[in-house]
């Protein structure tokens, strides 16, 4: 497992700061060498918490995974074998929301003023999010801006 430098990614410094505050370290892995690992898996090894990331991910996907996992930690989520699938979905949604909120803040920071319309499809494509996040993206932007936006596909 090797390390990968973060060249030219200014937002990564925010993520690294959050990881440091939460005492989390990143470990990169090659899935062909470690087929049992999955992106974003968190393990404690000798008292240090590691998040495992596939070396073939793009930088944006890696950042999304890290923000999602930081969301789990910041919400105090714990892995319990006996928890219900409803509890699991709730925790995943909270972690996804955390990641999308950070991405929405980053997206809105590019504008000098609040945009009249948010192009959700463009946002999802830019940050390489999965289409399943569309509804949550809409919710997050509606909360941030304080009013429902026209959906970009309605324009």
Which ranges hold each PLM region?
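Active-site hotspot residues in diverse enzymes, especially metal/ion-binding acidic/histidine motifs
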Residues: 1-155
């Amino acid at each position: 497992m090797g390390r990968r430098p973060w060249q030219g990614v200014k937002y990564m410094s925010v993520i690294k700061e959050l990881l440091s505050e939460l005492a989390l370290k990143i470990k990169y892995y090659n899935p062909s060498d470690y087929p049992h690992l999955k992106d974003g898996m968190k393990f404690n090894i000798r008292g240090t918490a590691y998040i495992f990331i596939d070396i073939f991910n793009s930088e944006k996907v890696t950042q999304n995974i890290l923000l999602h996992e930081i969301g789990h930690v910041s919400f105090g989520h714990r892995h319990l074998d006996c928890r219900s699938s409803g509890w699991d979905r709730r925790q995943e949604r909270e972690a996804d929301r955390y990641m999308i909120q950070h991405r929405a803040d980053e997206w809105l920071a590019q504008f000098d003023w609040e945009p009249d319309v948010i192009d959700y499809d463009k946002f999802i494509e830019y940050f390489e999010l999965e289409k399943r996040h569309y509804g949550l993206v809409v919710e997050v932007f509606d909360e941030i801006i304080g009013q429902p936006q026209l959906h970009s596909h309605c324009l």
